Structure formats: C-alpha cells, structure tokens
C-alpha cells in the first residue's frame, strides 16, 4: 500500500488533543473522518507527536497508507476541502510519497517546539487561546540564562507529568532558548523526543525565574532533585506549538 507523509498545521484550541477518543473531537478523529470521505476507506493516521488538548502545530507530521497511489496534490487538496467542510481548524500543508520504512513517529530524529508568552499588562483580545498571558514583567535574559542549565542529557523527572508513560525520564535536550520580541517572549525547545508536559513544565518553572521568585540555582536544584513537587506550575497548553519534525 502506498505510504504518504503529511505535514500539517492546526489550532488545537477546540480539540481534546491528537489521539482518538470516544465521543470527543480530536485532531486524529477529524483527519480520519476526512480521509474516509476522500478515499472511502477506514484509515489510521500515525503522527510524530501526540499533542495534548489545546496544543497547536505549524509543522506536525503524520503518515497514512492508501490502497491507491494518489497524486500528492490531489490528496492535499481533497483533504483540505473535506476538513473545511467539516469545520475543522486543520490544514494539510504538504503531501509526499515515502517508502514503507518511513514512520512519522519512530523515524523522527528531532522535534522542535515553540512556547509563546504575551508579557504585558493588558490581556490578549485576539489570540486568547494561542499564547500564555503573564501580566507581571518578566526578565527574559534571566530566563534564558537559567534555561541553559537544563540543556544536555538529564533525568527530567521533575519536569514530567506524574502520568507520563515514558519508560525512562532521561532525555537529551539540545536547545532551550528564551528570546523577547517586544511584548512577546518565545521559548524554543529542541530534542529527539520529549516527556509528557516537559516543555510546559519548563515554561512554568522559567516563569518563576522571570518574575524573580527563583534564581538560576533554584532551577538547577529543582532539576537535580528529580522530584515532581519541585517543579514550578505547568504552563497552559495555549502557548505551545509543535513547529517542525526532522527525519
């Protein structure tokens, strides 16, 4: 069966995450509904990253197997038409033929995430579900300097969900940069894979540094404690975006 790689974007605000769930609207269920209307087949789509409820994507990757070897632009345009008809905030950006050995999840060698913070006194009126609004002034430079203590290979028990199903809490974080652009602060994270709630836990803990409640040493101590209770708050999903997957 011909295998196709799909690159897509979506606004996760009104979805219960990626993974199919009974009686809940998810990204996977919406895509599989569109795939059925297009192909007449009950197909299963596999993704690089099963994003949580409220998390967005600008460069999510998935793969699906069809019985027919469709033209890639036909797949893209037909799926987009069905998604729009369904009222879904999902768009197929690119479609590519790939070998059977390609797996959107297991072939990935690097995942890139962005976390957006709106740092101003006034709340957002337009992007309420696409940023984390923090009215208190944040020191982005202090946040960036502290974030470098998290880069590298570590036991990230402190920064993963208590419900994380990963066998090991050890991950190698390749990048965690914090940059301010006007009223917005961007956190850029890069690794082969991440733990459940890891980036949102980073964002919440770095917020503590940004407002001056924590020092860099406090963040480092929280990391080495390997204790979930030492983590700062878990930032809301609204600010998180999966931006790119490398293979």
UniProtKB/Swiss-Prot annotation:
The active site is at 52 (nucleophile). It catalyses: uridine(38/39/40) in tRNA = pseudouridine(38/39/40) in tRNA. CDD domains: PseudoU_synth_EcTruA. Keywords: Isomerase, tRNA processing. One of its GO terms (biological process) is tRNA pseudouridine synthesis. The keyword tRNA processing applies. GO terms for molecular function: RNA binding; tRNA pseudouridine(38-40) synthase activity. It comes from the Bacteria. Its EC number is 5.4.99.12. InterPro entries: PsdUridine_synth_cat_dom_sf, PsdUridine_synth_TruA, PsdUridine_synth_TruA_a/b_dom, PsdUridine_synth_TruA_C, TruA/RsuA/RluB/E/F_N. The keyword Cell membrane does not apply. Substrate binds at residue 113. Belongs to the tRNA pseudouridine synthase TruA family. Homodimer. Formation of pseudouridine at positions 38, 39 and 40 in the anticodon stem and loop of transfer RNAs. This is tRNA pseudouridine synthase A. The gene is truA.
């Amino acid at each position: 069966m011909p295998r196709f790689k799909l690159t897509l974007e979506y606004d996760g605000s009104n979805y219960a995450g990626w993974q199919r769930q009974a009686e809940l609207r998810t990204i996977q269920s919406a895509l599989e509904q569109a795939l059925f209307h297009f192909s007449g087949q009950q197909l299963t789509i596999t993704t690089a990253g099963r994003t949580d409820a409220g998390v967005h994507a600008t460069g999510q990757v998935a793969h699906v197997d069809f019985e027919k070897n469709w033209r890639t632009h036909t797949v893209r345009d037909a799926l987009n038409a069905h998604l729009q008809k369904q009222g879904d905030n999902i768009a197929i950006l690119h479609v590519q033929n790939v070998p059977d050995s390609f797996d959107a999840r297991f072939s990935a060698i690097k995942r890139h995430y962005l976390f957006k913070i709106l740092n101003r006194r006034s709340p957002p009126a337009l992007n309420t579900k696409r940023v984390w609004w923090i009215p208190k002034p944040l020191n982005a430079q202090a946040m960036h300097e502290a974030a470098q203590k998290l880069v590298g290979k570590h036991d990230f028990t402190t920064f993963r969900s208590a419900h994380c199903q990963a066998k090991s809490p050890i991950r190698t974080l390749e990048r965690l940069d914090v940059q301010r652009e006007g009223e917005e602060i961007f956190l850029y994270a890069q690794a082969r894979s991440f733990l459940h709630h890891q980036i949102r836990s980073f964002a919440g803990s770095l917020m503590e540094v940004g407002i001056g409640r924590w020092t860099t040493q406090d963040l480092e101590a929280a990391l080495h404690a390997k204790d979930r209770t030492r983590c700062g708050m878990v930032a809301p999903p609204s600010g998180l975006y999966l931006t790119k997957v490398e293979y």
